[in-house]
Swiss-Prot record:
GO terms for molecular function: FMN binding; isopentenyl-diphosphate delta-isomerase activity; magnesium ion binding; NADPH binding; oxidoreductase activity. Mg(2+) binds at E159. The keyword NADP applies. Pfam families: FMN_dh (PF01070). CDD domains: IDI-2_FMN. This is Isopentenyl-diphosphate delta-isomerase. Its main location: cytoplasm. Belongs to the IPP isomerase type 2 family. The lineage of its organism: Bacteria, Bacillati, Bacillota, Bacilli, Bacillales. It comes from Listeria monocytogenes serovar 1/2a (strain ATCC BAA-679 / EGD-e). It is found in: Cytoplasm. InterPro entries: Aldolase_TIM (IPR013785), FMN-dep_DH (IPR000262), IPdP_isomerase (IPR011179). Its cofactor is FMN; NADPH; Mg(2+). Involved in the biosynthesis of isoprenoids. Catalyzes the 1,3-allylic rearrangement of the homoallylic substrate isopentenyl (IPP) to its allylic isomer, dimethylallyl diphosphate (DMAPP).
Length: 358
């Protein structure tokens, strides 16, 4: 029985990658398209003046984007994690692994995850567990990678679509609180592409969580991935569940939103999406599907070159926004229009204040 469970988990990991890559072949418009930064025609800064340094988990990181959680737990995904770790090392950005449950249940799969530390010994690496994982096992996940931080992914929509997924969730908050108290490294609670509302973020802040990843809709769709894995595809009505990355970021502009650190991910396409998310308060911006898609289609070297180009393009965008660093960028005025403005208005966000901030 154990062997069958292990094979099922490994197959699921490989299917997640294959279906995720397929999704990224045809992308919908960015959920940040209705956000427009108000720039300048007479910049105060030169490109060389721009400082892209950000602070996450109490540490300075030279660039405000990272490789988000995606994979691990099979022979095939070991190779992918190794390549992602090489990219993270060369570009000098943080990296998260996918859920480590497979390795916690089958020690022969540990190397499919800790390969990232072997290849990137000095980088910022994030471990990853579900709130289903007991504390002692979660501590093993951290130790497995010598991780700098721990992602706890919350994914009820994905679990419900997954035939073998969890059906009990009421203990999650208590478990997360235990992690906050007992983890030797910082905790970040992340969605998996369904987005967090400000109410969810407040619930987490109230138990001591200091960082969340809003992880909105618009990128890899795990409801669709799990539905595609089902023979009956019985959950096709749930494929649009959740709030987008743009909506989640706008929601955090509400006057009652908790004042905790947040990251943004989900459907990030390019440096323009990155700067918009940073301007809306994110401390860093994560990508998973697009990086794996680039890795699969173009290889490690081309993906590194693309991300290095993004750094230079991002500096140029900061010049246009008249911001020397992320702190200044977060005071840059921006216009929210279209459907996103309608949504923000219904959520009682002061869009006029955003448009005229200084």
């Amino acid at each position: 029985m154990q062997k069958n469970d292990d094979l099922l988990r490994e197959r699921r990991k490989d299917e997640h990658v294959a279906l995720g890559v397929k999704q990224n072949e045809q992308l919908a418009p960015s959920s940040l398209k209705d956000i427009q930064l108000i720039g300048t025609s007479i910049p105060r800064y030169n490109v060389k003046d721009i400082d892209l340094t950000t602070t996450i988990f109490g540490k300075n990181v030279p660039f405000p984007f990272y490789i988000n959680a995606m994979t691990g737990g099979s022979r095939h995904t070991k190779k992918i994690n190794a390549e992602l770790a090489e990219i993270a090392r060369e570009v000098a950005i943080p990296m998260a692994v996918g859920s480590q449950s497979a390795a916690l249940k089958n020690s022969s799969l540990i190397d499919t995850y800790n390969i990232v530390r072997e290849i990137n010994p000095n980088g910022m690496i994030l471990a990853n567990v579900s709130p289903e994982v007991a504390i002692q096992d979660g501590l093993q996940a951290i130790e497995m990678l010598e991780a700098n931080a721990l992602q706890i992914h919350i994914n009820p929509a994905q679990e419900l679509v997954m035939q073998e997924g969890d059906r009990s969730f009421s203990h999650w908050l208590t478990r997360i609180e235990e992690y906050v108290k007992l983890s030797p490294v910082p905790i970040v609670v992340k969605e998996v592409g369904f987005g967090m509302t400000r109410e969810t973020v407040k619930t987490l802040a109230d138990i001591g969580v200091q960082t969340v990843d809003l992880a909105g809709k618009g990128g890899t769709n795990f409801a669709q991935i799990e539905n595609d894995r089902r023979r009956d595809q019985a959950y096709d009505f749930l494929l649009d569940w959740g709030i987008s990355t743009g909506q989640a970021l706008i929601d955090m502009q509400h006057q009652d939103a908790p004042k905790i650190a947040y990251l943004a991910s989900g459907g990030i396409r390019n440096p323009l999406d990155i700067i918009k998310a940073l301007a809306l308060g994110a401390d860093s911006v994560g990508m998973a599907g697009q990086i794996i898609y680039s890795l699969k289609k173009e290889g490690v070297t081309k993906t590194i070159e693309k991300l290095e180009l993004w750094k230079e393009q991002l500096r140029g965008l900061f010049v246009l926004a008249n911001a020397k660093n992320i702190a200044e960028l977060k005071t840059t005025p921006l216009i929210v229009s279209g459907e996103l403005a309608k949504w923000g208005t219904l959520r009682e966000i002061n869009l006029v204040k955003l448009a005229n901030r200084k």
